[in-house]
């Protein structure tokens, strides 16, 4: 509680007193707030387009959220997603060896990363965030499958409230897949995954778009036009 006549001096309001000594000192009272038993999953796009400032900002957000929420006794899971190769991997080779049948679906191998599991302490897992910025890790992004994977991890947890936050800078892109499937193949699967979670799951889904308007896909979303 703020703007009280007695209690703990509110240091954040001291500048107002310095500027105008006629302003009264402000006091506050701290109260314990009971958080609902909560777990938060942070799912980070680890594709090549995130290279540089964007992935640095994502890592900083993960660091701040992880430390802050752990102090509030909220469990945090930090995940990432990309592909194992550029322009196809073993999936594409298997398709070629099978005489390239039509409508093959995904033709790259997904890479899903656990930087911090919900049950790990922050002190043990924090250094893993540095791996997020390794150049050789950041390749292509197949978002729909990553959402389903992250959702399936969190939905079975015992906490009462489950929140999943996605940080991404664009639509799913995998050149090998899109060359031989409809151009909206990966986007349509992403929409399906979002709809499944938003309409049929107890998990609360939110998204942050970095330089990309994700409000077209997610019901609860914000867009950051510049990673700065």
Identify the role of each PLM range.
Residues 1-228:
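Acidic, glycine-rich A-domain
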